[in-house]
Each structure stands twice: as C-alpha cells, then as structure tokens.
Amino acid sequence: MKCLRIFATPDGESHFGEVDIPTTLTRSFPNGAPAANYESSRSAFYEASRVRFVHIPAGAREADFHNPPGRLLAIWLDGEVEFETSDGEVRRVSAGKAVLVDTHGKGHISRHPPEGQNSIQVVLPHGLDAPSA
C-alpha cells in the first residue's frame, strides 16, 4: 500500500514522494461467521501519540507555506485538498486519502474547497518508518 508524503531535502525544499507501507494478507475474523472470514491486506500497527479532528471553515481557502508541529498523517474526510510543494509541484488529494506531511524546511501550501473541509490528523512520533511492536 502506498501513501503520499511531502518531505524536505537537506536544502529545505519540499517535494512529493510515496511511502510504501508493507502489508500482509490475513484472515479478517477467523472466529466469526463464515461471511466475515475473508482475507484482507493489513499493515502492522504504527505508534500514534495524538489524534485530533479538524474542521476547516468555508472560505478558508489557502494556507501559505507551513509545516505541522510533528510527524503528522492527515486523512481527508470530504472534499478535495490541493497541496503545493516549494519546488512548484501541485497534487490534489481526494476524500478518503491520507498524506504524511513534512515537519521541516520550507513547508507546503494547502488549498481547501470553498465549502470547507473535515480531516483527522494523527501524530506519528516515528512516522511510518517503524511499526510498533
């Protein structure tokens, strides 16, 4: 499984990339009803220290270059957000998608839909580098 990420290079410029999240095919509910006993691909658990729910109000269209305070996974619940990195590349992220955002360097620009938007932000102290035990 892949997750979009925004990262900074040593010169501080931000860029897009992907994180490959390893998954394993496992039985979902082996002790449940036969209809619930299907196989699905699952990753290991990752340590999360905080979770918050965010509502971006209607009219809050653009957030200029910024970084979150820590390793953050943003999951968009509705609408579509547009990100721009300092190298000028622009990507759109639709509802249901997640982005691992940069924590240093020049940051990124976020552009939100005129009607507002909702997201969940999960602080991952170790990012997606190391699953928890």
Give, region by region, the residue ranges found by the protein language model.
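Short acidic-glycine-tyrosine-enriched beta hairpin
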Residues: 21-23, 86-103
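Short beta-strand His + acidic residue motifs that chelate non-heme Fe in jelly-roll/DSBH
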Residues: 63-65, 83-84, 92, 101, ...
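Short acidic, Pro/Gly- and aromatic-enriched capping/linker segments at domain boundaries
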Residues: 1-8, 89
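A short glycine-rich, His/Asp/Glu-containing loop-to-beta-strand
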Residues: 10-64, 117-122, 126-127
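Tight coil/turn sites that cap or link beta-strands
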Residues: 56-61, 95-97, 104-105
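A short hydrophobic beta-strand segment most commonly corresponding to one strand
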Residues: 98-103, 114-131
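A short beta-strand-loop-beta hairpin characteristic of the jelly-roll/cupin
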Residues: 67, 73-94
